Every structure is written in C-alpha cells, then in structure tokens.
Design a protein with these regions (language model features):
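Internal maturation/activation junctions in enzymes
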Residues: 22, 85-86, 97-134
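A short core secondary-structure module
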Residues: 143, 147-188
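Core alpha/beta catalytic barrel or barrel-like domain that forms the active/cofactor pocket
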Residues: 49, 53-54, 76-91, 112-122, ...
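Short beta-alpha junctions and helix-cap segments that line functional grooves
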Residues: 105, 131-132, 149-150, 191-195
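Flexible, glycine/threonine-enriched loop-and-boundary segments that flank and lead into catalytic domains
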Residues: 25-40, 44-52, 117-141, 145, ...
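A glycine-rich, basic-preceded beta-loop-alpha segment at the flavin cofactor/substrate interface
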Residues: 185-187, 191, 196, 206-220
Length: 220
C-alpha cells in the first residue's frame, strides 16, 4: 500500500509541491497542498508510527520495514519524506522517555495526529553540536524552560520537537547537554524560512524559544 500511495498519489503531485513550496504566514507555516494531503493519505493507511509498540497504537514493525516505506516516499517526493520521516523522533521517545511521557505522546504519533522535528543546529553550532548554547533551566516543579535560537530545523513547525539544549551551568562541551521534548505553544516563534535551492515543500525553519516549557527526555 505504501508503494501505491507513493507512486499513484504522491509522485504526480511532487512537482506542484516544489513549485508552491512552504510559506510563513502570520507566524505559521503553510504546507503546499500536496504535502498536507499526502500526509493524510499516509495516516489513513496506518503508516504513521509503524515501529511503535502496539500498546501505543503502533504496528510494532521492525525498523527495516519503516526504512523501506521512507525510501518509497522519498523517491516519490523528498520534501514529503522529510516530514513523514520525522515520525522517527517517536522512536527516540520510546527508547529514552519514562512511561508517563510515552503514554502521553506516542499514541498521538501512531495516530498521525502530530508531526515532529529534531531541533539540533544553532547559528554557532552545526556539525559541532557540542557547542550548542540554547539554555535549559530547571523549574521548582521539575519542568524546564528553553531560551535561545535554533536554525536550519526541518519541519520546525511540527507540533512536537526534540530539542538539544544546555542543561548544566558552566559547561562548554557535550557533557552539559540534554534532550528535551517541547510541544508547540506561544513561547516559540518561527522567525523565518530558509530560501533553499530545492525541496521547497519541506519547511526549514529558524526558531526563537522564549521561556518555552519543556520536559527532560531520559536523564541529564
């Protein structure tokens, strides 16, 4: 079914998707029509969160099957693959998060209710990720607040993001970093979309976090 969707629905719309691109309107990203409709077709086919355990609504399929589906979508439209493929952040949540976080977020990925992003790169930290400076500050109630900028974030408009941030004061290397789950709210602003040479249907965002609430994934 993945091959049928990719070949009969996604691929014929790929050129129009690339011409239309993504737009930033009043602070919100608007996907090209073919992207939104393609994601809905994949959701209806139960291809979202396919590697997740059944207790969270997934299909409990091996990663190799997921990779094959992603390759099919990529061949049809790499822009849609970028967004669909970011369902993979649910695997990170499943591996490292506590049971409460898994129960709260994984069923939403499996149902195709949310899209994701992996917010790593910053203006001064690209391939050298140990230089990440976005700051995470722990609150008295055990939650965290994020402050700083992320750049070149694929699908940074996604509802759920995994954000790499500096959680330990006085550190300058990777040992001071932790991963956080952030659910989109008014404390994160999309400052702009990158003007790319291609794959225009996949939005690449610059993000400004201003005291954004987040949850620690795993341990510090």
């Amino acid at each position: 079914i993945a091959g049928e969707i990719a070949g009969e629905y996604i691929e014929p719309r790929a050129e129009d998707v690339d011409r239309a691109g993504s737009e930033l309107v009043a602070g919100e990203v608007c996907y090209a029509r073919g992207i939104a409709e393609g994601l809905e077709r994949l959701r209806q086919a139960d291809l979202m969160g396919m590697t997740l355990p059944r207790r969270y609504g997934g299909l409990n399929l091996p990663v190799s099957v997921s990779v094959m589906v992603i390759e099919m979508v990529s061949r049809a439209d790499p822009a849609l693959m970028n967004i669909f493929g970011l369902q993979d952040i649910s695997e990170t949540i499943n591996k490292f998060a506590d049971e409460e976080m898994k129960a709260a977020y994984l069923p939403r990925f499996a149902a195709g209710e949310v899209t994701g992003s992996m917010a790593l790169t910053e203006p001064e930290a690209g391939s050298d990720l140990q230089n990440v400076q976005l700051k995470a500050t722990e609150q008295p109630d055990g939650t965290w607040r994020l402050n700083g900028v992320k750049r070149f974030i694929t699908n940074g408009c996604g509802q759920i993001s995994l954000v790499l941030a500096r959680s330990e004061e006085g550190t300058t290397d990777a040992r001071g970093l932790s991963m956080f789950l952030y659910e989109r709210d008014e404390h994160m602003r999309i400052r702009r979309l990158e003007d790319k040479l291609g794959i225009h249907g996949s939005p690449t965002c610059e993000l400004q976090f201003d005291d954004a609430p987040a949850l620690l994934v795993g341990e510090r």
